[in-house]
């Protein structure tokens, strides 16, 4: 999409907003392909920002954490079934704000990045994850043995 839109943006500038993930900023266990793909989106975004900034084209990426969407229902189960309840409970536990994000919150970030209010922001990957990535290691927050298996 970027390849085809850049020529149209050359005269008037604009804002490109790519969707990455916090998994592109720090690797998730057993998700190497996904981590690499999202890390690639982040570095692609930075490259576009550098290459086209003089044309008044800004490029940023959003890096959502766990957002309450149908994708979460498909991958982890709905908020009504046991698997979905367990997944959501675990996500809330490791999130300093104690909840999952909402699509509306992500949309507001995208709207801000598309607006002139963010005219001096480019080449950034902005996490919207409720503070999950503020921890050096999620196990620090858990205070129990749930993460010991991944340190061996």
Residue ranges and their predicted role:
Residues 21:
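Residue(s) in the substrate-gating loop at a strand-loop-helix junction
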Residues 64-74, 134:
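Short, flexible catalytic-loop segment of classical short-chain dehydrogenase/reductase
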């Amino acid at each position: 999409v970027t390849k085809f839109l850049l020529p149209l943006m050359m005269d008037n500038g604009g804002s490109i907003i790519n969707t990455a993930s916090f998994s592109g900023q720090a690797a998730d266990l057993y998700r190497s392909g996904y981590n690499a793909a999202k890390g690639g989106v982040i570095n692609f975004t930075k490259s576009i920002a550098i290459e086209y900034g003089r044309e008044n084209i800004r490029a940023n990426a959003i890096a959502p954490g766990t957002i309450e969407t149908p994708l979460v229902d498909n991958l982890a189960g709905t908020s009504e079934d046991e698997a979905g309840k367990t997944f959501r409970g675990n996500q809330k536990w490791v999130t300093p704000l104690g909840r999952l994000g909402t699509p509306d919150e992500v949309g507001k970030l995208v709207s801000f990045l598309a607006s002139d209010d963010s005219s001096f922001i480019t080449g950034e990957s902005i996490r919207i994850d409720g503070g999950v990535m503020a921890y050096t290691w999620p196990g620090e927050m858990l205070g129990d043995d749930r993460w010991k298996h991944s340190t061996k």
